[in-house]
């Protein structure tokens, strides 16, 4: 089901009623506020194959009347809305206009928003990291960060050594970024053992295949060895680059020397 944002049919109507006598009004301004507004909703099922239009009327934040295209007429939600429901249901032109809103309002707006809201796809960025840097065999929290994706329907699963984890999972839920993208954190409580491989798998409409990101549990000594190896490799590249630079510079200097008096 796709749902378009509810749009107020008119600006909220605020009625200010002054009920105090002038002498009291001079002491303080205590005018009561009354809020009356309505909302139009479009509910889509399987694209525009089935569409439901709702027009809901509220008074002081309480719904009192609605029109439902599935019903085809106005229905009172509270006694306050009953007079309006009876009045509008007795006017065929009003009922005809509301029933036609399924096409004139909902399907019409669906075509406008289709490319931006319905078909729009933004692939998520997925990263995995532990919340604590500490030795193995201690309680830790692995975080799968999924960010900057659209639409909001997404599935995130955790695996340990290829087997899905069903317990110890905590999620922040869907968080709006404010730029038409979402983010979420899905965390796995675990006690990592040396050699274990943890995988975060993400499925999203923007992806043809699930995205998987691994985190391998390594002992401190193994991590130090790996860092030493990477550091040695980088240092070797630096020395190699410096040697090549000096060599080619010397070669260029020698080729530029010629005996005086020769024609070239």
UniProtKB/Swiss-Prot annotation:
Listed transmembrane segments: 226-246
Residues in compartment: Extracellular: 27-225
Cellular component terms per the entry's GO annotation: late endosome membrane; lysosomal membrane; MHC class II protein complex
Signal sequence coordinates: 1-26
Disulfide bonds: 38-106, 144-200
Region listing for Beta-2, in residue ranges: 122-225
Keywords associated with the record: Adaptive immunity, Disulfide bond, Glycoprotein, Immunity, Membrane, MHC II, Signal, Transmembrane, Transmembrane helix
Family listed: Belongs to the MHC class II family.
Protein name per the record: H-2 class II histocompatibility antigen, E-Q beta chain
Organism field: Mus musculus (Mouse)
Taxon lineage: Eukaryota, Metazoa, Chordata, Craniata, Vertebrata
